[in-house]
Amino acid sequence: MAATTYERLKLHVTPEKFYVEACDDGADDVLIIDRVSTEVTLSVKKDIPPSAVTRPIFGILGTIHLVAGNYLIVITKKKKIGEFFNHVIWKATDFDVLSYKKTMLHLTDIQLQDNKTFLAMMNHVLSMDGFYFSTTYDLTHTLQRLSNTSPEFQEMSLLERADQRFVWNGHLLRELSAQPEVHRFALPVLHGFITMHSCSINGKYFDWILISRRSCFRAGVRYYVRGIDSEGHAANFVETEQIVHYNGSRASFVQTRGSIPLYWSQRPNLKYKPLPLINKVANHMDGFQRHFDSQIIIYGKQVIINLVNQKGSEKPLEQAFATMVSSLGNGMIRYIAFDFHKECKNMRWDRLSILLDQVAEMQDELSYFLVDPAGVVLSTQEGVFRSNCMDCLDRTNVIQSLLARRSLQAQLQRLGVLHVGQKLEEQDEFEKIYKNAWADNANACAKQYAGTGALKTDFTRTGKRTQLGLIMDGWNSLIRYYKNNFSDGFRQDSIDLFLGNYSVDELESHSPLSVPRDLKFLALPIIMVVAFSMCIICLLMAGDTWTETLAYVLFWGVASIGTFFIILYNGKDFVDAPRLVQKEKID
């Protein structure tokens, strides 16, 4: 079977069936989904009834079972990102979720409400920016992985050969994946970030591409998904590949990021920065070893760059990480701790060169992947930098962009684009493209995990820290605080539902969505607001004497402050927590 999926499709809808027609040249296949039995079969175009309602679609994302029954999810709009070795790369920009059922009369009021909530969750994930696909190219693998494949691999369908870590609709495609004959309708979709640019240096034109692939294992939002799970999957794991294509030669440099691979948590509790807690009873070495065993198999040597603070609440995590690496004693793993905030305080971001100089020799050893126009591999990447901070976002983004630039400098010199002694930083036009692309990558990764754009992107875009950048960081930090405390439970539930970590069972006697709230959840905020309002009123409407006014103000002021601290003490009861999957049971 050729490793392609159908590019042009039409969806024909009748009350009994969905017909997905392949419209590529010479294609006669029609995928038929029975809306009653949910059976999936392959047929031909003559079986499409003329009475069907028809519209174009650009791919099948998959199917999901909710309270009302099954739903078909299709891509209705797409945007061309660019061409990748003559393969077109698309971004899915709009979707439609179609019910198999014609009516909802079989549902109770509670079931209707639950189904509406589950639909809202699905639509929330679909509204997240960053879903990419190609009908002819496997986006889930790096150039180096694709260069080292068998003829049998080349004949597999895109779905079969895809790296399952990065297929975000893998759960949605489970019914189609069970039937190889319909795999040309099964479109693997990547979540992350892709940008492509045609660039010129010294009159030599080359394509520069940046791809970030988010893992769907242990996926979620900032404070609810930290550390690793029992399989060794790290939270917020992202593989970032930088690619150069010049005169038929291809080069790539791969980096990874992922949460500190221990069992730890940092649950939101209304405090600006919740205290990270390391699990005291878990077998950390088991999960830690699983994580790095798989990383070494996939990528080779591991150079860990740990950017967390080496004092305060982050210090125990840094010490535990260093201890685990030392205890494991694996020669394939190197550990470097760099206190980013301490080294770069007072906007001394030039001090990042200390870290770059420290790892320069290691980076030369790891090398990069390079293949000539004839397909001969001239160089392979022997390992990766695995960078992390607490969120694996802001500090990590800055370091990754600097390491990638150093690799790109070496690649472009070897390819003959840069002259000997020429610096990439001196190429103003390309530098602007490079910095903006890495800042856009940072924003995409941050929005997907933390809910806002990245911090510190003014440095990534301009090469220096600015006062405006600090103000924007403050604004984004406030938005993060609100989302992390008051909307991330819903976001986490949405991701768990989409990825199949939770399966809807309409026969469940108790809906996980209906969580009774304690009386204090309503009473305490009302008391605090009333007390604060009375305090203001007493200030504005003075009593007969200043002592009387002071007494009233003190009484209501103490009442409002006291209530505030009671709410803060019980912070975990007031945040928006996930309801579908209780992750603390496996943390």
Swiss-Prot record:
Lumenal-facing ranges: 542-548
GO molecular function: phosphatase activity; phosphatidylinositol-3-phosphate phosphatase activity; phosphatidylinositol-4-phosphate phosphatase activity
BP terms from Gene Ontology: exocytic insertion of neurotransmitter receptor to postsynaptic membrane; phosphatidylinositol dephosphorylation; vesicle-mediated transport in synapse
Keyword vocabulary terms for this entry: Acetylation, Endoplasmic reticulum, Golgi apparatus, Hydrolase, Lipid metabolism, Membrane, Transmembrane, Transmembrane helix
Main location: endoplasmic reticulum
Ranges that cross the membrane: 521-541, 549-569
InterPro entries registered for this protein in UniProt: SAC_dom (IPR002013)
Reactions catalysed according to its record: a 1,2-diacyl-sn-glycero-3-phospho-(1D-myo-inositol-3-phosphate) + H2O = a 1,2-diacyl-sn-glycero-3-phospho-(1D-myo-inositol) + phosphate; a 1,2-diacyl-sn-glycero-3-phospho-(1D-myo-inositol 4-phosphate) + H2O = a 1,2-diacyl-sn-glycero-3-phospho-(1D-myo-inositol) + phosphate
Renumbered residue ranges of the record's region Essential for phosphatidylinositol-4-phosphate phosphatase activity: 452-587
Keyword Signal found: no
Residues exposed to the Cytoplasmic side: 1-520, 570-587
Subunit structure comment from the entry: Interacts with TMEM39A. Interacts with SEC23A and SEC24A; this interaction is reduced in the absence of TMEM39A. Interacts with PLEKHA3 and VAPA and/or VAPB to form a ternary complex.
Protein name, as recorded: Phosphatidylinositol-3-phosphatase SAC1
Organism from which the protein derives: Bos taurus (Bovine)
Gene name tied to this protein: SACM1L
